């Protein structure tokens, strides 16, 4: 079930979306095309949640998301960029389902407690592939088969581990320790389920309204800024460093939003409001332990 579905077919131009992500390959439902489209999107469209801290209510209909990401060259969160990718894949001929996931908070080492993430399941030639271009921290760029076998990519291992009633997306770096990304059910959801997520996060009392979060692939590394913490995932090693002042924030944002200068300006505006004195409004950040046990 497509969160961007409506009573009529999408009218936005597929050519423009594919130009936005720089994809020039064949438009046919093959694994090779799926991999190339996912790679092109992940490397071209930044992840960002700038709407919530600015009090902007995003529209999730197809035309609005397309306008934000393509003509206006914006980024987006899972409800936007994963939904846009799902719609594009369907128009090319892929069978795509959208399911709800519960994200793992890497800085706090716990799940959010909410089904607050959209994940795509692409059914192709008898295999189900997990696709996700809308997650802040490191996830696989390429589709991962839903078969529990480890999948190697850019110095990391990924797998989809089944439990009693959930599937846990996990990754392992050079230390060999499997850590969760999110968990989900193979249970396609209607559009209304995703509208509920949006409404929750836009309430002023939620942490998203006071959180600056953006991410991008850069020179083979995944850079994720979460308020005043920069999480860098590079060839199997993840590190967390503080971003202590506006100059450092500007440098990080310039790298994450390269070729998207308007997003740098907007993100710095959010930074100044959240950190007028370079103070962390949500308290100290727990260290990420290299000996963290695998979540059960």
PLM feature spans:
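Residues within well-ordered alpha helices
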Residues: 17, 88, 252-253
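Residues at alpha-helix termini
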Residues: 20, 91, 255-256
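Cysteine-centered nucleophilic/redox motifs
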Residues: 73-100, 120, 214
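His-Asp-centered catalytic microenvironments across diverse enzyme cores
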Residues: 2-21, 25, 40-46, 103-248
């Amino acid at each position: 079930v497509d969160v961007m579905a409506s009573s009529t077919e999408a009218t936005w131009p597929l050519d423009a979306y594919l130009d936005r992500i720089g994809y020039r390959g064949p438009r046919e439902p093959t694994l090779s095309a799926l991999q190339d489209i996912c790679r092109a999107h992940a490397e071209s469209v930044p992840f960002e949640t700038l709407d919530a801290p600015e009090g902007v209510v995003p529209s999730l209909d197809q035309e609005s998301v397309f306008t934000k990401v393509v003509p206006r060259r914006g980024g987006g969160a899972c409800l936007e960029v994963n939904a846009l990718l799902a719609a594009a894949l369907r128009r090319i001929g892929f069978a795509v389902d959208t399911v709800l996931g519960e994200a793992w908070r890497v800085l706090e080492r716990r799940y959010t407690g909410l089904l607050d993430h959209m994940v795509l399941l692409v059914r192709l030639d008898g295999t189900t592939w997990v696709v996700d271009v809308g997650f802040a921290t490191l996830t696989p760029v390429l589709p991962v088969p839903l078969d529990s076998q480890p999948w190697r990519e850019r110095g990391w291992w990924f797998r989809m581990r089944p439990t009693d009633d959930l599937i846990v997306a996990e990754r392992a770096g050079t230390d060999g320790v499997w850590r969760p990304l999110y968990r989900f059910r193979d249970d396609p959801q209607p559009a209304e389920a995703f509208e509920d997520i949006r409404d929750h996060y836009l309430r002023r009392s939620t942490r998203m309204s006071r959180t600056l979060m953006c991410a991008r692939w850069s020179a083979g590394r995944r850079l994720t800024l979460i308020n005043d913490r920069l999480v860098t995932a590079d060839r199997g090693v993840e590190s967390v460093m503080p971003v202590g002042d506006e100059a450092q924030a500007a440098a990080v944002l310039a790298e994450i939003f390269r070729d998207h200068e308007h997003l740098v300006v907007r993100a710095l505006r959010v930074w100044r409001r959240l950190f007028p004195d370079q103070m962390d409004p949500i308290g100290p950040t727990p260290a990420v332990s290299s000996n963290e046990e695998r979540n059960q």
